[in-house]
A protein has these predicted regions:
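Conserved class I S-adenosyl-L-methionine
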Residues: 1-51, 65-69, 153-177, 201
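A short SAM/SAH-binding and catalytic strip from SAM-dependent methyltransferases
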Residues: 122-134
């Protein structure tokens, strides 16, 4: 694991029990994303519908704020994955507190998810891409573990750089400086078919499907 990944994991582990939900989820997400939280929860309900009882992945799981709601809406297994051990620990506590017996959590690198190809009929990536280094390998992994015919649901907050900058340095910019359309293009390059793309203030919500061929 790279130094930057270890640093990010440590920062979010520190935040898990202290201020992640009050400041980030209920503060920043609402300030910059408007109704983003409600829309992300709605995406979770769609994921539960399309999974039809099959397993669902939510990466990154964070403190399970969104994931535990997904687990309540789903009859099958929900797996939360996060690079931050503190987030995983907090998520397991939340699962126990909320009696979400179908929620399991694992610590894992977004670039090397510990699941076989075509595992999940629905994959969630809720409000996390903007802080994960390496958009292309992250999306590639999410696409890999999505089952053929399955769906990837993404919500992400970004502060896009000017178009000229993005066009000139797109491969070098962090995800938070890309536009929703830039992220959608990466998803399409991973082999998924874009179904919907919508904006909510500085947030983008994307739904994509993995072809069955």
């Amino acid at each position: 694991m790279s130094r930057i990944k270890r640093f990010i994991g440590s920062v979010y582990s520190f935040a898990a029990d202290r201020f992640y939900e009050p400041i980030v989820v209920n503060g920043g997400f609402k300030l910059f994303g408007g109704n983003l939280n409600d829309l992300a929860i709605e995406q979770g309900r769609w994921a539960a519908d399309v999974a039809e009882g099959g397993p669902i992945l939510d990466m990154p799981v964070g403190t399970a704020y969104f994931t535990v709601r997904l687990a309540r809406a789903h009859s099958g297994l929900v797996v939360g994955s996060d690079i931050a051990w503190g987030m995983v620990a907090r998520s397991m506590e939340v699962a126990e507190e909320e009696a979400a017996t179908n929620l399991r959590c694992v610590q894992a690198d977004a670039h090397a998810l510990p699941f076989p190809d075509d595992t999940f009929p629905a994959v969630m990536c809720t409000n996390g891409l903007q802080v994960i280094p390496g958009l292309e390998p992250t999306i590639s992994e999410l696409a890999r573990v999505t089952k053929a015919g399955g769906y990837l649901f993404v919500s992400v907050l970004t502060l896009p750089a000017p178009r000229a900058v993005r066009e000139a340095r797109r491969d070098r910019l962090p995800t938070i400086m890309l536009s929703g359309s830039d992220i959608a293009a990466v998803i399409e390059r991973s082999g998924l078919e874009l179904r919907t793309l919508r904006s909510e203030r500085l947030a983008t919500l994307i739904e994509a499907r993995k072809p069955t061929f």
